[in-house]
Amino acid sequence: FLSMYLNLIFVQNGYGKYCMDMEVNDISAIRYPCPRYIELPRKPLEDRLTAEDKQLLLQAFVRNKDELEHQIEESNKVGDKILILTDPVCTLDVREQIFRDIIKMYEKEGTIFLKPHPRDLLDYQKLFVEYPQFDASMPMEMLNFFPNLRFKKVVTIFTEVKGLPFADEAVRLGPDFMDAYEDPLIHRQNEQI
């Protein structure tokens, strides 16, 4: 009541006064759904796009499209690709260590690509210069539109990665992984409600 109607306290996941609804691709993938979630799968929208539409979207959202297409082509010659999706967790120094550890866990399996989260303020371009990177402002769904782009694995901490058409396997490390890096009370908020 205090958050939904009076806006006196902040509670995440759509319980705020100004949230009318939250569109999600698949409600079943959410462990603690909010009554304001509305399931609206993106697949029917995507299926209507032509090849030209997809290229136009890539041009609009991907700043370094030509460079990335070249890196994708080169990595296709070498072998498997691993995509690591970052999350805006912890302090910046701890976050850097987290993603260095994740890279170390998966770099033997293929060429590492990074896709920073839009709210992630860590400077991956500077700190992880040796890895190809997708722009943080680019929606993850744009990866569906790169021709010949296939990842052996997509790895993330908290981002939902169920059913990604450009990945053979999705790995969501989750709160158990994060327990090693910060107090569990910080990232297990939904479990406390």
What name fits each language-model region?
Residues 1-27, 145-149, 160-163:
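Active-site and donor-binding regions of nucleotide-sugar-utilizing enzymes
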Residues 1-4, 93-106, 136-142:
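Well-ordered, non-membrane alpha-helical segments in soluble/globular domains
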Residues 12, 20-22, 85-90, 115-118, ...:
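Structural motif
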Residues 23, 30-101, 110-120:
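Active-site donor-nucleotide binding/catalytic segment of nucleotide-sugar enzymes
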Residues 39, 131-141, 171-173, 187-193:
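Short acidic-hydrophobic, aromatic-tinged amphipathic segments that line or gate anion-handling sites
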Residues 91-94, 120-126, 178-182:
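Short, charged/polar "capping" segments at the starts of alpha-helices
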Residues 107-136:
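Catalytic donor nucleotide-activated moiety binding site of glycosyltransferases and closely related
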Residues 142-186:
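A donor-sugar binding/catalytic signature common to diverse glycosyltransferases
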